[in-house]
A protein has these predicted regions:
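Phosphate-binding P-loop
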Residues: 1-7
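Hydrophobic anchor at the beta1->P-loop junction of P-loop NTPases
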Residues: 12
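Conserved lysine of the Walker
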Residues: 20
Length: 173
């Protein structure tokens, strides 16, 4: 019996304005160009406004619906007010993905690239054992952890590819 394929989950983490979104956008582009299917889950440490005022789904939410969903022939989007959501539960919506990349989650146990930009941060804020590489424009170093420049996207993708391949063989991260 074949093992069920499970997406490899990794994060891009760091403090606010450290360049997570820009790095992640480039990393997604690089990985998809390597013919992998990628999903992204963004963690927001604050409550966010998911819809625009005036849309039908916005109106239904404000009328009291605890959940709304919109779909067309090729895509769908759902909003459900539910406390306690986490990456593992959301990942179930992307079973066909090769990679699920999470933006944020600096205190999680997911393997991660930690962003450190000198203009906004000077030191690591993530659990050292979870860091795949520091991505930085500073001299910051941590023992045994590779350091990448802010634009070393191909090297970051190589790290992910290698780790995902190892994970496939061993079943572990």
């Amino acid at each position: 019996m074949d093992a069920v394929k499970k997406p490899f989950i990794a994060a891009v983490s760091g403090i606010k304005n450290s360049g997570k979104t820009t790095f992640l956008e480039k990393l997604v582009k690089e990985i998809t160009e390597r013919n992998y299917k990628v999903a992204v889950i963004k963690h927001d440490g604050h409550e966010f406004q998911p819809d625009r005022e005036g849309t039908d789904t916005y109106r239904m939410q404000h009328a009291g619906a605890y959940g709304t969903c919109i779909f067309s022939r090729g895509q769908w989007q759902m909003l459900k007010k539910e406390p306690g959501m986490d990456v593992e539960r959301l990942a179930q919506f992307f079973p066909e993905a090769d990679f699920i990349l999470v933006e944020g989650m600096k205190n999680s146990l997911y393997p991660k690239f930690e962003m450190i930009r000198g203009s906004v941060s000077k030191e690591s804020v993530c659990i050292p054992e979870t860091i795949l590489a520091l991505v930085t424009d500073t001299e910051q170093k941590l023992p045994g952890i590779p350091v990448l420049g802010l634009d070393e996207i191909k090297k970051a993708a190589d790290i992910l590819e290698k780790l995902a391949e190892t994970n496939k063989k061993t079943g572990e991260i």
